[in-house]
């Protein structure tokens, strides 16, 4: 059992030797790559040694069981521990998403429902901000287009984590949030107290660590400049500081107007553009990988309705995993972990099933 782990143990040992060589850090790109891979393997190595230790203890207990009742009494407990350790190791051996350890750019757009949808988009952004805070992550507002009532027509926020462990990476935790989030509640603009349904779309993009990691040919870019505008479309700048960047090969378009200068908006736009191109490339890889296609959760498609937030019933329901709870007030305040974990566990099971086929 777990014969394939030996190759990973050897790789881990080789990486530790490299990281112990000060000369490696002269190449920061290589050092980061080795650090990420080391973090990916650390959990597997620890889990394997734990399983191996219990296996050996069980073998010794069985050998001594006939002569010593105390050893015989340990056998059932060790067998249960061995199965638990084996299950953990099997899950760790599931091929991980290569982007799991990355930071993300989170985009939220108000959808059906006009002003109410924009207000809900703002509520979602606040929810994710508080969840990030609870995990010790840092957030940075990149761009926002406000509605007349103070919501967001669209907004982009960077989320930066504090761990190299892929399982604890920002993208690993947030990637299943992509899709349509539907809300049912009485809008602030509703005078009759009627419940309305509106929606907001969420897109989670893995962020490129360094600009040189993803080369973009400047000849592939079309850059337009214009005057920035505020709620209602009124002009808020007398200079052409807003920037629209089109990546011609993919057709991806990024518009940025929040910063005061054209240069700052261009830099922010390129940051988002790199993330979108990286996501586009990963989608193409996923389409060619049958194991990835069998994952029941992961999606970049914001047209898929993934969750409903019902305020009158204080209920949240995830339509992919079947998760349901009546603590919506807590969820909107950032208590997202149980909801997110349900998606992660369903995805892990789907990947395990795919490996077994």
Swiss-Prot record:
Residues carrying N5-methylglutamine: 234
Example of a GO cellular component annotation carried by this entry: cytoplasm
Listed SMART domains: PCRF
Protein name (record): Peptide chain release factor 1
GO MF entries: translation release factor activity, codon specific
Entry superkingdom: Bacteria
UniProt-listed InterPro entries: PCRF, Pep_chain_release_fac_I, Pep_chain_release_fac_I_sf, Prokaryotic/Mito_RF, RF-1
Gene3D superfamilies: 3.30.160.20, 3.30.70.1660, 6.10.140.1950
PTM statement from Swiss-Prot or TrEMBL: Methylated by PrmC. Methylation increases the termination efficiency of RF1.
Keywords, comma-separated and alphabetical: Cytoplasm, Methylation, Protein biosynthesis
Family that this chain belongs to: Belongs to the prokaryotic/mitochondrial release factor family.
Subcellular location(s) per record: Cytoplasm
Primary location: cytoplasm
Lineage: Bacteria, Bacillati, Actinomycetota, Actinomycetes, Micrococcales
HAMAP family reported for this sequence: Rel_fac_1 (MF_00093)
The keyword Secreted is annotated on this UniProt entry: no
């Amino acid at each position: 059992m777990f014969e394939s782990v030996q190759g990973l143990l050897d790789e881990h040992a080789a990486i530790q030797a490299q990281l112990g060589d000060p000369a490696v850090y002269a190449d920061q790109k290589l050092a980061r790559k080795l650090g990420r891979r080391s973090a990916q393997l650390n959990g597997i190595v620890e889990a394997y040694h734990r399983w191996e230790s219990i296996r050996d203890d069980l073998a010794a207990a069985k050998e001594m069981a006939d002569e010593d009742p105390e050893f015989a009494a340990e056998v059932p407990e060790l067998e249960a521990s061995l199965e638990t350790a084996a299950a953990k190791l099997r899950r760790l051996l599931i091929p991980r998403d290569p982007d799991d350890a990355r930071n993300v750019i989170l985009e939220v757009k108000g959808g059906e429902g006009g002003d109410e949808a924009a207000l809900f988009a703002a509520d979602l952004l606040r929810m994710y901000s508080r969840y990030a805070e609870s995990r010790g992550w840092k957030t940075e507002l990149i761009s926002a287009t406000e509605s007349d009532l103070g919501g967001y027509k669209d907004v982009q926020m960077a989320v930066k984590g504090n761990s190299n462990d892929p399982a604890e990476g920002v993208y690993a935790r947030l990637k299943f949030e992509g899709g349509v989030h539907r809300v049912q509640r009485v809008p602030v603009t509703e005078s009759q107290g009627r419940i309305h349904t509106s929606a907001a779309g969420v897109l989670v993009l893995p962020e490129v660590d360094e600009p040189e990691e993803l080369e973009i040919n400047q000849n592939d870019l079309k850059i337009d400049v214009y005057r920035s505008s505020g709620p209602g479309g009124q002009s808020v700048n007398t200079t052409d500081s807003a920037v629209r960047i089109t990546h011609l090969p993919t057709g991806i378009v990024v518009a940025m107007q929040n910063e005061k200068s054209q240069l700052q908006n261009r830099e922010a736009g390129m940051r988002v553009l790199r993330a979108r191109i990286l996501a586009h490339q990963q989608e193409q890889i996923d389409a060619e990988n049958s194991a990835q296609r069998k994952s029941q959760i992961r999606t970049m498609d914001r047209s898929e309705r993934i969750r409903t937030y019902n305020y009158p019933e204080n209920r949240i329901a995830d339509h992919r995993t079947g998760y349901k709870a009546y603590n919506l007030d807590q969820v909107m305040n950032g208590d997202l972990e149980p909801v997110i974990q349900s998606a992660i566990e369903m995805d892990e099971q789907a990947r395990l099933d795919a490996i077994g086929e």
